[in-house]
Design a protein with these regions (language model features):
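Non-catalytic interface/linker regions that flank or bridge core catalytic/transmembrane domains
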Residues: 1-128, 132-133, 317
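Histidine- and acidic-residue-rich, metal-dependent catalytic cores
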Residues: 82-318
Length: 318
């Protein structure tokens, strides 16, 4: 069994499980040590400066399990979701080029699995509706963006990764907005909204010089809150000038926000969210992309209304 255990990360490990209660070195940075042997200790400690190394190690282990063909697709997707959450947590703490490149690997793994396993499409669609609303919203928006991009005909994996990165990074500018505004459990006042509306420009400034991100990804971060009739923000540009990636992220953002549990609102079922978007938020989204989003969840646009029952969801590999 021990031979099949994964290698340990290059960190020194200590234990307090000693008679005098003082830390005792279990393993030097590069010393071979059995992972199975560690299970003999109730708690293993590392130095604070090694925390990032251990986080990267855990992320890579989780990520690798997400592409193992011998695992059920549900388990692979759950592994990728966990890796994505770890990556995004680091990204919001430090939106550095290094952390953005790490996030790109996670998005690439989602796309890789989606393009090779028809079942992954259905699991992804369900996955995006069940994350609590914190950093996970960025992961959900990335997932929805990838799904919608594939649905409308994107087949090149690098394009889908760019779309997914746009979804993942769309709210990165909120690192520059006061936490009390971000976490307010109710409606924002005019001053707070004025601050919140700065996040697309802040986000664009953070990522504009990162060479591994494409121009269309960067513009999606800037433009995802533009609207029809030049009523959006930050630049109130004509709707025809808003990029396709930006429009994909806009609808993915809204849909994921509505279908995710928040401190002040219950998560809506996909059908309920689509009805609300159609009836109340149509000025914020592209009509053709909305039609495709409806089809993803097995419905017909003409069947969406505030009354009656939701249409039966079809299982499709598209």
């Amino acid at each position: 069994i021990d031979l099949k255990m994964p290698p340990l990360p290059a960190v020194a490990m200590f234990t307090y499980d000693t008679k005098d209660g003082k830390p005792e070195l279990l393993r030097e940075y590069d010393q071979p040590y059995s992972p199975l042997a560690l299970t003999a200790y109730p708690e293993v400690l590392i130095k604070l400066e090694d925390l990032k190394v251990l986080q990267h190690y855990a992320e890579q282990r989780i990520l690798s399990s997400g592409v193992q063909k011998n695992l059920p697709v549900e388990k692979r997707m759950e592994s990728l979701r966990r890796a994505a959450l770890l990556s995004v947590e680091e990204l919001f703490k430090d939106p550095s080029p290094e952390n953005i490149n790490r996030s790109r690997k996670v998005v690439g793994s989602f796309v890789y699995l989606l393009m090779r396993d028809p079942q992954a499409y259905l699991v992804l669609a369900r996955l995006s509706s069940h994350d609590p609303y914190t950093l996970q919203h960025s992961v959900g928006a990335a997932v929805n963006s990838i799904i919608l991009g594939k649905k409308i005909g994107f087949r090149n994996e690098s394009d889908l990764i760019d779309i997914g990165m746009a979804g993942l990074l769309h709210d990165i500018g909120k690192v520059g907005v006061a936490p009390e505004i971000i976490n307010k459990p109710g409606p924002l006042d005019d001053r707070e909204w004025s601050e919140m509306r700065k996040h697309p420009e802040i986000g664009y400034e953070i990522i504009k010089d990162i060479p591994t991100l494409t121009g269309v990804t960067k513009m999606a971060v800037l433009e995802h809150h533009e609207e029809k009739h030049m009523k959006g923000y930050p630049n109130k540009i004509p709707w025809d000038d808003v990029g396709l990636y930006s429009k994909i992220v806009a609808i993915a953002d809204i849909f994921n926000a509505l279908t995710t549990e928040r401190s002040y609102s219950k998560a809506k079922e996909p059908y309920e969210a689509l009805v609300l978007i159609k009836d109340k938020l149509s000025n914020k989204i592209d009509d053709e992309l909305f039609r495709e989003m409806v089809m993803i969840y097995g419905g017909q646009l003409e069947g969406l209304s505030g009354a009656g029952t939701a249409p039966q969801q079809k299982e499709t590999s598209e």
